[in-house]
């Protein structure tokens, strides 16, 4: 159906968008203010807002806005129907409107249709914007008829008479004006050579069928129907427009009576001005810098294209290409200059003027009035002490600030600010200056009652208005200057204080010649408003107690943060011990209780006792697949501590640390500590030669960029007497505390190992003729955490002095450990890749003798094996996981699209149901009125409760009315039949 009017202009907007766009105005007067802003931006000196009764239309009247602004030409009028097309943002003048959306959103919030008449120069244009027309004609896109005439001849401007006739026929059918004479009459209402008349009709209704705007209660005002607000500016359009502009100069008439617009800064008692210098509000400046940077990039790309064309063009087109290049260079320079200016503005501090004063006319109407570009955005915003109930500090104080558009940008409906964080910061600052104002003026909690009594307020703080007596009126007039605006020059003049205060009323017509002050009784005189005292914000440094309190809070916060990051001891349970190895030595016995180990050459005799236990604690580390180096570390360290096993089982006594070799880290273990994470035990008293010739052979294969696996151990060494045994205790930083139950579980295990090693002790005693042990056994191991799917790396630290032959140096537990290690590796690979062939290093059934003689070679083989695992198997596994993730993401995106489509369909169904329900409520209200049963005034819940109560009670009147209707209908039928027969 959209192709029925191909010649007419279209607003390039969908019909459903018009309704959605109008809902941005939650505050109804905010929609009306959009239309006032358009008149002010057009330079209008006078604006009339009035209603015209018309019972044929929805709502019963039309709402009209008439201004004497610059008007619009046919070309300019065609721009207003498009969304976001406005030249105001590009202008150097500071217009209120910036988005090109106020006319559509504001008028469509009030009613369904509007018709606009405008005059400029020699033309008259009519713009017909109607939702009713589009709905009746089943048009999904908004079609806008726009006929134009010449002012002198009243003839059509267009050359297409068929289009002109079609536009007029649509206007006659769907507008309140049915003939061309009525249309011309509306142009005649515009009394000047230029101006605009906006007529809004088919007004929006409430649930009770009444219009949202009430023009019947007060014939000189437009009220908001059903409003229960305390502040008049929220329910009276006259009160709202009186404070709508920070610097009012346009005269506003509502229902043919002038609005007493207020220069709010000069209507307060004891006003004071504060200069707030800040660099906090940078949101709008950052957006401007981004736009300038994008413009520079676009200009530079155009310049590059022009340079390429100059290099490739022929001689004939060379001159034109150079001209294009020159223009591109100039454009780049201009854009770069603009970018530098925007960046300079971003760094520049801004100064905001904050005004404060007391509203002595009604102290309950206090709060902050926040303007943006001279337009009111928020009003009666409570800040600081005003937020507290029954607080006297700041009672009756009004704060005013006018924020430039480039500092903080308002929203599209001009009722909020886009940057909520900056707005909240502004309110906080205004609360601080409110306290400073109360200090400067002496209006504090102590003398506030005396101050209020001077203006006629009683002691009760709930009293809003002062007493209406001559004494208090004179006091108010002496404290607050009376300013009035001239109707000719629109300048504000201050009347002298000798004026009769009882007869001081607002005049509908006042000019400068009526001013008793001879210095300002002419329109040629310069406007001179009262000066406002300048206040300063005291910057008193915080007291010593406040500084100490802040420092204490920061220290506590830092300590809590350190406590969260502090590593805690971790206990390795007995069931995780994987390797136990022993090595024996022979030495002489000596029962001296005060024996000390000397490392530099003393002849010592030690008790023959040897046993050590190696414990590998596994720790799951997350493998980083993207790295390319080896992911395995082998760490071998020796940590020794002497302690008596018998004393360990019986009691815990004070221990004395013993000096150890350089590779052993010494620490002191407290008696209160109950850590029992014993990973290696060595019970031996080596001879002097053994200590001199002992060398620790360790190897490790490190990854170049490994970030995860570093295991640090703490060694605690103590010596009590000659019969004590040497114990190596390793505690990890991430371990937890150990209970006594776990300690008891380890003791039987140690005893069992002691019994198993008796034969080895005898064998080592027979081979004690060897000078020293030449090798240090270090066994690399790995354990697997299959539940998480990651390889865990384990470091085993062990140390012993071997004095036997190569055949007996390698014990059976070490071979068993290596076998378990290989089996675990096979389980890992088969878990990830059951279809691949395992490396040959892992397929060998047992270790060869090379491990005994050259452990480095076996370590190289293991490194090659792990490199193959990482470079081959893990890469394949990574690709497989990536494919799975991609498929999952694709499925989730597809489901999301389907969900959005279904959500949109459900939303449309919901809107249709709401419209049906709304129509049903309207019809129900009409039905109840016809049946004389009254009707509920309120929302849907009140309607439901009213109907339920009506159905439950036996309403005789309802039954009687039904009986009367049926009886009357029966009597009418025979009478009509008799009349028809008599006529025949």
Curated annotation (Swiss-Prot):
Main localization (coarse): nucleus
Pfam family, one: zf-CW
Gene that encodes the chain: MORC1
Record-linked PROSITE patterns: ZF_CW
GO MF annotation list: zinc ion binding
Nucleotide-binding found in the keyword field: no
Originating organism: Homo sapiens (Human)
Organism domain of life: Eukaryota
Subcellular location: Nucleus
GO annotation terms (biological process): behavioral fear response; cell differentiation; epigenetic programing of male pronucleus; negative regulation of DNA-templated transcription initiation; regulatory ncRNA-mediated gene silencing; retrotransposition; spermatogenesis; transposable element silencing by heterochromatin formation
Coiled coil (UniProt feature): 284-353, 737-761, 900-934
Function: Required for spermatogenesis. Essential for de novo DNA methylation and silencing of transposable elements in the male embryonic germ cells.
Keywords recorded for this protein, A-Z: Coiled coil, Developmental protein, Differentiation, Metal-binding, Nucleus, RNA-mediated gene silencing, Spermatogenesis, Zinc, Zinc-finger
Name of protein: MORC family CW-type zinc finger protein 1
